[in-house]
Amino acid sequence: MSRMNEGTTARILLVDDHPMMRRGLRDLLELESDLEVVGEAGNGEDAIHLAQQTEPDLILMDLNMPGIDGLETTRRMRDADIDARIVMFTVSDEQSHVLEALRNGADGYLLKDMDAE
């Protein structure tokens, strides 16, 4: 896995089936000069293909997507030797999902805060 050094740009792949979520994340991440969104995917199959093409440092992965879900996508990415850090980014706070994500190769689990404050 490539390690980030001072002065380098982190390459990020966004994986979520909701285009508005991807757009919002992209807009926020691109406010930082050391973060670059290198691709977006709306499903697991496209995510695997893009990860192989773009070789991101970080993948933000939604859990619930049509076709193969984020858990299976993560497992397939690890089986394909995709070594980017994978962080599940989801509304699900079920302990079983957290544990399964980590078992399938995720490096972290981040909750989408959906409460309006």
Question: Predicted segment positions?
Answer:
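Conserved acidic segment of CheY-like receiver
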Residues: 9-21, 25-29
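Active-site residues of response regulator receiver
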Residues: 16, 62, 90
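Short hydrophobic/Thr-rich beta-strand motif most characteristic of the beta2 strand and flanking loop
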Residues: 34-42, 50
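Acidic catalytic/metal-coordinating carboxylates
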Residues: 43-46, 68-72
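Short amphipathic alpha-helix used as the core "switch/output" element in two-component signaling
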Residues: 49, 71-83
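Active-site beta3 strand of CheY-like receiver
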Residues: 54-60
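Receiver (REC) domain active-site loop signature in two-component systems and cognate sites
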Residues: 65
